[in-house]
């Protein structure tokens, strides 16, 4: 690995750092499954200029569209994806299900905060700048979910809804699901001065200082409550606000870009998909 990247990339157990064609990380929990491709891209290696430097994935933050398009093309090529799909993330609980079979229905930028799919060669990207990007994977049924979860998603227990939808739509069993929670706002920086107004009482168990909360631990607790097993959950302890050299942080920077968490199924031959 490039010596400069070695200096800036934190050494964390369970994270596999890659540097080509641009820097990104992979999870050890998911990396042994050949039917799944995934990556958490850093902010480095793209085309965008400050304050969006450099691998910004969002058209909605003020960056030049041609730079965003070039960055998304880099990500698509890195995963060798046939298609790359993004969502219009709205900090709510909308779930889009894309399944194989039937006529192809194209949805360019659906309003949703989670996608569940069994379609191969379709890469789905979550845009982040402090919120959690979470990958859920059922290796037995080759079903993938990718979730954007901010504090509002935690309050709504959005992850439990995603798990229930995976079970209802594809017959997934909770004990088979693997989950990875990526770089996001850490307990060191997740301050909510009005927490008594916005958080339910049970979140007090995750308060680390008078106004600071561990939202990654909240997500783990909610996944366990949804039926996942403890050893099937991996959490990155990287805080995006602390590591703006690697990731974008809305809290830390204000006007800035969005980094991407991407996942894609690879098994079998490509099939047509229905979206609903």
Predicted regions and their residues:
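Active-site microenvironment for binding and transforming phosphate-containing groups
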Residues: 1-276
């Amino acid at each position: 690995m490039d010596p400069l990247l070695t200096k800036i990339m934190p050494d964390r157990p369970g994270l596999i750092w890659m540097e080509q064609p641009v820097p990104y990380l992979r999870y050890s929990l998911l990396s042994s499954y050949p039917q799944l491709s995934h990556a958490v891209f850093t902010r480095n290696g793209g085309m965008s200029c400050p304050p969006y430097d450099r691998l910004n994935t969002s058209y909605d933050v003020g960056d030049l569209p041609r730079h965003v398009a070039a960055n998304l093309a880099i990500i698509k090529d890195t995963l060798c994806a046939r298609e790359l799909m993004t969502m219009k993330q709205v900090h709510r609980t909308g779930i889009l299900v894309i399944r194989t079979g039937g006529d192809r229905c194209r949805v360019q930028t659906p309003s949703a905060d989670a996608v569940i799919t069994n379609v191969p060669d379709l890469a789905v990207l979550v845009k982040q700048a402090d919120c959690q990007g979470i990958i859920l994977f059922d290796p037995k049924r080759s079903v993938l979910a990718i979730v954007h979860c901010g504090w509002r998603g935690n309050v709504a227990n959005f992850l439990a809804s995603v798990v229930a939808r995976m079970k209802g739509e594809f017959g997934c069993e909770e004990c088979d699901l693997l989950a990875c929670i990526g770089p996001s706002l850490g307990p060191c920086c997740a301050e909510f001065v009005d927490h008594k107004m916005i958080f339910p009482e049970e979140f007090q168990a995750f308060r680390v200082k008078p106004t600071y909360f561990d939202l990654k631990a909240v997500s783990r607790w909610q996944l366990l409550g949804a039926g996942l097993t403890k050893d099937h959950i991996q959490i990155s302890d990287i805080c995006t606000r602390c590591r703006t050299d690697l990731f974008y942080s809305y809290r830390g920077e204000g006007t800035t870009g969005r980094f991407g968490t991407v996942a894609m199924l690879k098994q079998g031959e490509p099939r047509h998909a229905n979206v609903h």
